[in-house]
């Protein structure tokens, strides 16, 4: 199996030493991701605690906008990545995080606070463990990509279908598979981010830095999606619904 080759003269994280540029790059990725999570949490809390606003969004066809708008933004950013400017990509990321907050507000209205905290902490532990493993492992994870993408497409498709079927059994199956898929994607994405950094940092200085900046945003988007979906799947599996 082919290994990821890092340029000579750079220190590999797998060897216990850290390339300063890579560390700075990943710090930027996690800064975007963290900012996105904070924004989503703030929007979700606001929507869930403003009853008239929650009623307008989730009691009308606007709920479909809340469900599908984030997916549309992700697809647009992915397909237009090369042509979008850094500022446009940043705006899309923050807009996506805000819309995800609107969508996540429904979870605050359905599940107990204790369940939400437990699911969040569980997702955080799994995410951090897999991110660290994906970053430090000597194993080439590139072969996971095709299998994980097939699983991801299946999870998305089944989730959309279940919006109309409302099947408890299908929801359970999707959640179990989803936990596996997003756990794997976390490790795979971390190794991919490291590989992309070394690929782009060796190019023309100006063009390389511009590309790395955009890769930080897209990397944050990928990791954000892994974490949020892992959180939602765990909440669906183990969350306790509010009474009444």
Residue ranges and their predicted role:
Residues 1-244:
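A hydrophobic alpha-helical transmembrane-helix feature that marks the membrane cores
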């Amino acid at each position: 199996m082919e290994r990821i080759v890092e340029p000579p003269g750079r220190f590999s994280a797998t060897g216990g030493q850290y390339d300063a540029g890579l560390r700075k790059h990943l710090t930027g990725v996690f800064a975007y991701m963290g900012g996105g999570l904070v924004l989503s949490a703030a929007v979700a809390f606001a929507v869930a605690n403003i009853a008239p606003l929650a009623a307008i969004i989730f009691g009308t066809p606007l709920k479909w906008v809340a469900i599908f708008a984030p997916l549309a933004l992700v697809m647009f950013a992915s397909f237009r990545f090369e042509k979008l400017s850094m500022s446009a990509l940043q705006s899309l990321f923050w807009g996506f995080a805000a819309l995800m907050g609107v969508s996540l507000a429904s979870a605050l209205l359905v599940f107990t606070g204790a369940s939400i905290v437990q699911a969040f902490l569980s997702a955080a532990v799994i995410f951090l463990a897999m991110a660290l493993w994906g970053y430090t492992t000597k194993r080439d994870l590139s072969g996971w990509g095709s299998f994980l993408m097939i699983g991801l497409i299946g999870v998305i498709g089944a989730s959309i279908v279940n919006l109309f079927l409302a099947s408890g059994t299908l929801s359970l199956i999707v959640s179990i598979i989803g936990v596996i898929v997003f756990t794997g994607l976390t490790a795979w994405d971390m190794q991919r981010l490291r590989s992309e950094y070394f690929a782009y940092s060796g190019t023309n200085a100006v063009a390389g830095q511009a590309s790395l900046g955009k890769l930080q945003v897209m990397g944050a988007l990928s990791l954000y999606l892994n974490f949020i979906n892992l959180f939602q799947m765990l909440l669906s599996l183990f969350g306790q619904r509010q009474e009444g």
